[in-house]
Every structure is written in structure tokens, then in C-alpha cells.
């Protein structure tokens, strides 16, 4: 009886601590921690530390250059009444709503094409991935050339197809789609992820579907998509976060001091406005409040995505 | 000997001459001060990789503060780095930046007022142009020593003007109706695409110039009271915007302008892609070096009253509060901006240009004494370049600048956004400038709140 009682007892905190401490008798444990320390140090100092500091100054009127004092929740209240903060948040949401499906759709298309390539597949994977290596600032600069009215490379291509060329840089109706198109330049990263996921789909599932008379579209819809849904979900979350936080390319294209002539209310994204508040206007406290608000918004969106994903994402081997 | 080797030889000789001149100028400069400098002078925003004028002045100023060492990393002023330096209480001794920064940082107490520096080093402030001084003066104190001085005149492609039947008299900003007619005469298009801009008003950048030309002062002299939505400012924006809308509309206009090879030999003047536009004086130097045979002239920008006006911007030197080597910083600023230094480096450049067969198009500084001495056409120079130097030099006298403001960046953003909203057809000039006025008032109020 006593033995049975011990066997069914759930391990308490003391047990877990003893087990953790006993791990240090192993040499490998020390090595593992040795490798983790640099990352942990970087995280504490440059991420967690900065976040905590940001949270503190979000309740002050800190400007770096002048003495600061506590302002309570004033910065957070000011965000709600600042028309540019709200406008930039709306712009970021709209641009992300265009960008994420566009990027995922294109990456899936490219991955599906690459999955069929059997010769020189390594070469093609490299070619598709190469644009990911382009510095983001260079992408912003190239955007101005490639999307310049009827003269840019993209517009000339559209003209060749007899599609009217939009003024991506200056027409308020086309600025956000243009920015989304610019971000898709780095689609190769997700293409490679999707390709790996597609290659992992068991062939027998396709064979069984074919025997049942499923068309190529049904095989894709009912076999490929469910089987790669964890990867799709992962990229969906990551791209949403990226879309809401993207800065470099848009700043280079529209807000570089020499390009101020094309900045507009439509191109003003939330993180750009946050940067202006912090480093152009020296409103560090307000900018920190904006950063924490964005963090909260992203957390809520991610939690919602995870909740919804339970209906759509299939994890192989998962017990339901 | 090939032309290439001749040019290399010319520059080598010019280099030797420069070394001798710089040494002499430094000896001249250092003989005037009795203070012994020590330690290191840390400079932000002015490195050693600039052009010949920057390098030669650097050498002169370096000798003037010797035996103090000079630490001047390459790269322009970096606001983020500067803020980090302030936060860590490790400020540079000297910053070289755009004059528009001065008011904001002065208002927040991050800069040293230069009264004692000016007094102790006997810096003659009367040599600096009033417009430049105004943009570095906040609350009655000078916080920066002005250096370069941008002069904006109309650059005219005379080939385009002549072949379009446009005379110099028609390109008169004092007469908006005739100017618009001239713009449309020079403007060309193919369907909806612009193939030549007749007259580019340079919006949004030059809105302050247009506003002033129409009689508006968009910011009070103390930098605390914006007046962006005055009837004159609204009229100015309405007119300047109408010039663009009449020449294909903003989208087509800007898309075409973005195709220009601005710094190359196939620039918009060389290819006759523009009739006229207001521009800073440094662009004449670009034209003289990249396409010296272009048909170009300069015309002063005039206000509606017919008087020439110039919207001036430029750079300045300032000493952050907490600088450890303020004495050397003060001497450095004085040396970099005094007339003898400018004359020395200008003479070196003139000699180098003459030997290389390049045309002298002037060097325009915030020091009026220096400009009077150096901005004279060189002998044997083609008339067009000589005439341009004279026009720019004359325009300098009619300069205004936006006063130092505690919220310069927000003020500039407010009117830039307003102009862009008008250009993109999102608001009327009245709506846009009313909004800009509200934003500017709120920004300055917040910046001055204790």
C-alpha cells in the first residue's frame, strides 16, 4: 500500500528542484548551460531589460535630454486621442491584412512549383532564397526605382501585359498595396519553409487519394494543406507580427530625410510614427507607451490566432 | 601626356599647394590665440572623409587646437547616437549638424549657450549672416556657430526657355500668372506621361520659400508662434500646387522627376527635361562638373513685391552641455568658420579647379566677409558661370531662415504633411494648413511645457 501511495504521488516542487540539481552531476549539463549563458545574457540585457525600462519610462515624460517626471497613464491616454497614432495603427493593420495573405499565397505557389522540380532543385531553392539576403534598407531603395509610376521595372512589366500602371509611391489608393508588394520581395524564406513541409507529407497519402480518384486540386486542398497546416499557422503568426512591426524598408523609402517629399498619411505605419515620436520629437515616454500598446495588441492577436488555429491546424500524432 | 595624367598631375600639385597653404593658415590662426589646449576634442558629425574644402578646413582647425588630439569619426550627425551619448553622460565636445536641430535641443537645455565662448575667443558674430544667426539663436542666446549657407535661386535651362519662347522676364516668381504661362509653354507630355517639366516649384521642400514670397511668415521670430494657415500661406500653397496640377498632376509629375539622373552627366538640364526650378546653389557645382556645357543660368527668386528673396538653411557647430573640452571646441568652431579659413580653402579649390580645367561656381558660407572675398568669378571663366556666381552672391543678401523653435521637427513635419496631403489630393490647401497649424501649435505648447 505504502509503495503504491509513493508511486502515485505527483512530484512536488522539492522533487523537481532535486532532479534539476542532480543534473549538474552530468558534464553535459554544464556544457548546455555554458552555451545558453551568452543568449540568456543578451536576452536579459538587450531585450527583457530594455522592455522593463521601456515600461517604466512609458509612465513618464522622459525625453533623454531634459529632466523627467511621472505622468501616470497620460501617455496611454494620449495615444487614444492622437489622430496620427490611431491613423498609423489603422494603416499598419490594413497593410498587414494585404501583406500576410499575399506573402503566404505566393510562398505556397512557389513552394508547390519547387516541390515538383527534381533536377537542380538545390539551385532553384538557392535562387528563390537569395532575395532574403538583400539588406532591408536596399529593398527600400530599390522599391523607389522598381515601383516608380510608369517608369519602374514592375510598372513596365505591367504595361507589357497591358495592365494600367499604378502610381505606387504617391497614389493613396496604391501606397499600401505597394508596400505589401515590396515586403514580398523576401518571400523566399517562407517558400523554403513551405517546401520543407510539403516534402514531409507522406507520399502514401497522395497515392491513396489518387486511387480514390481525387483531382490535383483535391489532393492539394485535402492532403497538402492539412498536412502543412502547422507550418502555415506558424508563418501566419510570424508574418502578422512582422507586418505590424516592419520599419526599415518603409522608413528608407518614404521617411528618409531626402525622400520626405513622398511621405504621406497613407504610408505612416505605427512603428514609423513610434520612431518619429522617440527620435525626431524626443517623446521617449510616449513612444514607449506606444511600443507597449503594440506589444499588447500583438499578444492579443497571437492569442486569438492560437485559439482559432485549434479548428484549422492538424498536428500529426496529436491526441484529440 | 594624356589628359588623365595631366589631371592627376594637377591634383598632385594642388595637393602640395594645399598642404603649404593649410600649414600657413594654421600658423596664422594659432598665432592669434594664447590658450594652450589639451586632452582630446571629440567631434560628432564631421569626419575626415569629406571633400577638399572639408579636409583642408579640418587640417587648419586641427592645428589651431594643437596639442589637443582630435577624435572625429567619419559620418554625419546621428541623432540616435547623440541621444545615447546624452543618456550615458558621455557627450561629444562638439556637434556638427543641421541648424534646424539647434532650437529643439537648446529649449531642452542640452546645449551650452555660446555667450562666454564668443566673448572669450572674441568671435566676431557680425561676420555671420543674420538669417543664419537667427536659426541658431533661441531665447536671446546663440547656441550654434553657423557654417554653410544654402542659397536658393531659379535654375533655368536656357535652351528649353529659348526654344519655348520663354524669356527671363517671364520666369519671374513675382508675377504668378506670367510664370504659370511660361511653365505651360515649356511643359511637354506624351499622353498622360510628362516628358518635360516646365517649372518645378519643388514642393513640399520649398513651401517656406513660396509662403514668404506670398508675404507669409510661417513662424514667429521667437520660434514659438506658428502661422501656417494665414491667407498668404494658403494662397502660396494653392498657387504652387496649381503649377504641378497644370503640368500633368502630382503623380505623373513626380514619377517623371524621379527618373532624372540628378548627379550624372545625363542630368535633367543636359537632357532638357526641365525648364526652370528653384534649387540650392550647390547644384551649379554638380552641373559644372558633370555637364559643364549645359545651357544654364540663374535668376533670383522674387517675392510678390518684386524683391529677391532667399530661403536659407545650412549647418552649424554646437557644444553640448557637459562637454569636457569646451575651450578647444570653441576655438575649433571659430577657426572652421572664420573668413581667413574659408579664403584659404577656397583658393586651394580654385587653383585645383583651374589646373583640372573645371569651372568655379562659388562657395557659399554663412560668413558674409568670406563670401565677399571668395565668390568672385575666376579669370577666363565662361560668362554663364561668372553670371551665376554673381546672381547667387547677390541673392544671399535677401535671405531669411526659419527661426529656431523648440519643436522644429514637429513643425517641419506638420507643414510637410500638409503640403503632401494637398499634392495627393486628400485635402484642400485651407484644410491642410488649418490642420498643420493646430498640430504645430500643440507641438510647441508641449515642447515649452515645464
What spans do the regions from the language model cover?
Chain B
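Conserved N-terminal structural module of periplasmic/extracytoplasmic solute-binding proteins
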Residues: 2-104, 119-126, 305, 340-344, ...
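A local structural motif
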Residues: 64-74, 90-91, 165-171, 221-225, ...
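Short helix-initiation/N-cap motifs at beta->coil->alpha
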Residues: 73-82, 100, 174-178, 254-267, ...
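Short helices/loops that flank or line small-molecule/ion binding pockets
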Residues: 80-91, 108, 160-161, 180-189, ...
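Hinge/lid segment of periplasmic solute-binding proteins
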Residues: 100-152, 178-182, 297-299, 382-383
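Helix-loop-helix "hinge/cap" segment bordering the ligand-binding cleft or interdomain interface
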Residues: 118-119, 137-206, 216-254, 321-327, ...
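Extracytoplasmic/periplasmic substrate-binding proteins
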Residues: 206-209, 214, 237-335
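C-terminal lobe and pocket-closing loops
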Residues: 283-293, 306-312, 318-413
